[in-house]
Amino acid sequence: MGPLATAYFIEMVVKMTDAQFDYEHIPMVIYNKPDTPDRTKYILDKNMDNPLCAMMSLAKALEGQGVHYIAIPCVTAYYFYNELSEGIKIPIINMVDETAAYLKNRKIQRVGIMATNGTITGGFFRQGIEDLGIKVVEPSGKCQDKLMGIIYDGIKANKPFAMDDFCMVEKELRDKGAEVIVLGCTELSLIRRDFAIGTGFLDAMEVLAQKSVMLCSGKLKEEFNDIIT
């Protein structure tokens, strides 16, 4: 639903697949519909347009195309995961649960989350991680405002933004004891791609891409087994 994030997700899946020839790659059906009502706006204010109907229409359209799994490269959309899953007969890969499981398997004990206001307020990412016994720290209000500026005024608007703001949020989460910081917004994946942000990050969209390759009978390149920087 975010066009840049969607394009990058496709690139991730292709690059993660160990394929020598085109026909060894995973067949994909892409439905890019950026006019879907904003998920964060609705989570914060239920008087805003509810995106569920539009997302359900997308899911049913993909189901009609004969896909076996649906991957949604938008973390905030997982606020609606249960309702979407109940409305179709094919599985939606749960990026939140898969990220939490990945952290648990790596024995991470304390995690920081960078995400939209919708994801933070909705609490579903925090809950998904805490359910596996991992402690979660989140940005303060001031740092969250900086992060939203990066996501909405910078990346989504395709405009420059201050990496110093990103570093400020990172420092706060590290100071709170985060061993790993989850990039819990697919727009933030583009920062991971375009900037040298250092170690100790896990990109939730990379987890989704990795799981997509594995579920769809693709062969995962060995270098993508460990995706914590």
List the model feature ranges, each with a label.
Residues 1-229:
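Non-catalytic structural scaffold of enzyme domains
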